From Swiss-Prot:
InterPro entries documented for this protein: Rib_uL2_dom2, Ribosomal_eL14, Ribosomal_eL14_arc, Ribosomal_eL14_KOW, Translation_prot_SH3-like_sf
Entry keyword set: Ribonucleoprotein, Ribosomal protein
Protein name from the UniProt record: Large ribosomal subunit protein eL14
GO biological process: ribosomal large subunit biogenesis; translation
Family, per entry: Belongs to the eukaryotic ribosomal protein eL14 family.
Entry's Gene Ontology cellular component terms: cytosolic large ribosomal subunit
GO molecular function: RNA binding; structural constituent of ribosome
Length: 103
């Protein structure tokens, strides 16, 4: 599994109400936080700052610039042919356990 979290990386949220949904990293705040977006109309994940421990990177990446708008991210996802992939929900796994076991 890819461990690099960079701008444009597709990630899966592993904790919270959006657990199992995919999003795209659009900005890196610091070593602990990144800004992600679904965008909401595609995956249901709204733009927000998240702790890097609450996301799991995938091997997919889209070409977006840092701070890209939701519309730019949506166009990049569709151009990369990942729209259906982004809509799929997954059972998140974090360190070998599922998010439902983390309570």
């Amino acid at each position: 599994m890819v461990k690099v979290i960079d701008v444009g990386r597709v990630v899966v949220k592993v904790l919270g109400r959006e657990a199992g949904r995919k999003a795209v990293v659009v900005d890196i705040v610091d070593e602990n936080y990144v800004v992600i977006t679904g965008p909401k109309q595609l995956t249901g994940v709204r733009r927000r700052r998240v702790n890097v421990n609450h996301i799991e990177p995938t091997d997919k990446k889209v070409e977006v610039k840092r701070g890209a708008s939701d519309e730019e991210v949506l166009k990049a996802v569709e151009a990369a042919g990942l729209a259906d992939y982004m809509r799929e929900r997954v059972k998140p796994q974090m360190f070998g356990i599922t998010a439902s076991e983390v309570r």
